[in-house]
């Protein structure tokens, strides 16, 4: 359930009436007509107050977000980045390699560079400035090398990107209004030059419950991570990890951040909770 308040000055949705607060229940959405549903998905941030903390929101994201061009085992998504944005996705797991063009890989090349992924977000935000994007980024080791990644990514984020003005720096208390029209890049991999966005201090492999942090200079926030992707321990263990983190999200402090991955490498996870 998402609590929403009327906000003026957003171009992608009508403001709610009289400043009253509303509850949008996801289970009720199928009763809407297709046009209304598409509008809600495409501009759902416009229904929330500007002063809402990002860390207090449940923001939908996609694992290996740029893999719709791939086949079989390397393909994690069936929708392009643009289609994902229209569907309401606002957090993107992108894995560029250490090649000159920062090509995104997942076992093999996706044919999508990091710049092209950012460009897709830029186009969407230009058309719908009530929305904002988060990129969770790490270097993929399938091609290139670490030195090239450090150099090219540092140059891209700090100077050469045509979308430099889109990037916003991390703060624990960053609000939805401050993300509107912007892209927050949270990196797991080091690169040269100044940090743009935020750095995830550590991320253990195949982890069920980790406490890490997101930092930028003196700004720091606690980060909880559930990324248990290995399926060899069974589907029920993954379901339990997801449910535990849904519960943790409800109980954590508003200023604390949390990633709850529902992806699994060797099996399909069905809905963890049913009514």
Where are these regions (language model features)?
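Loop/turn elements at helix/coil->beta-strand transitions in domains of secreted/extracellular proteins
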Residues: 87-90, 129-134, 162-163, 179-183, ...
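Active-site beta-loop-alpha junctions enriched in small/polar residues
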Residues: 62, 97, 138-142, 188-190, ...
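Conserved, mostly hydrophobic/aromatic
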Residues: 95, 135, 185
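Catalytic cores of phosphodiester-bond-cleaving enzymes
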Residues: 115-162
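Long, acidic (Asp/Glu-rich), low-complexity accessory segments flanking structured domains
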Residues: 2-87, 100-127, 132, 193, ...
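C-terminal active-site rim and adjoining tail of enzyme catalytic domains
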Residues: 186-188, 192-275
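Short, structural beta-strand-to-alpha-helix junction motif
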Residues: 80, 113, 167-177
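Aromatic-lined carbohydrate-binding surfaces of glycoside hydrolases
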Residues: 89, 94-102, 142, 146
């Amino acid at each position: 359930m998402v609590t929403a308040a009327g906000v003026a000055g957003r171009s992608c949705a009508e403001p709610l009436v009289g400043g009253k607060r509303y509850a949008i229940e996801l289970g009720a959405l199928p009763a809407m007509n297709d046009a209304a549903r598409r509008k809600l998905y495409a501009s759902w941030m416009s229904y929330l107050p500007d002063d809402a903390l990002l860390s207090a929101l449940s923001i939908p994201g996609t694992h290996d977000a740029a893999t719709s061009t791939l086949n079989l085992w390397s393909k994690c998504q069936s929708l392009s980045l643009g289609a994902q944005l229209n569907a309401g996705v606002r957090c993107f797991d992108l894995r560029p390699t250490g090649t000159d063009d920062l090509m995104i890989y997942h076992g093999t090349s996706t044919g999508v560079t990091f710049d092209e992924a950012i460009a897709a977000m830029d186009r969407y935000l230009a058309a719908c400035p009530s929305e904002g994007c988060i990129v969770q980024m790490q270097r993929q080791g399938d091609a290139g090398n670490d030195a090239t990644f450090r150099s090219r990514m540092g140059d891209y984020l700090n100077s050469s990107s045509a979308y430099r003005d889109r990037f916003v720096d991390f703060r624990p208390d960053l609000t939805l209004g401050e993300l509107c029209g912007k892209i927050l890049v949270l990196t797991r991999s080091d690169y040269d030059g100044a940090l743009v966005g935020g750095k995830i201090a550590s991320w253990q492999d195949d982890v069920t419950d980790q406490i890490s942090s997101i930092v930028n200079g003196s700004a720091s926030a606690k980060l909880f991570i559930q990324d248990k992707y290995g399926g060899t321990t069974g589907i029920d263990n993954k379901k339990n990890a997801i449910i535990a983190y849904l519960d943790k999200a409800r109980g954590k402090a508003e200023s604390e951040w949390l990633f709850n991955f529902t992806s699994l490498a060797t099996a399909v996870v069905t809905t963890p909770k049913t009514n």
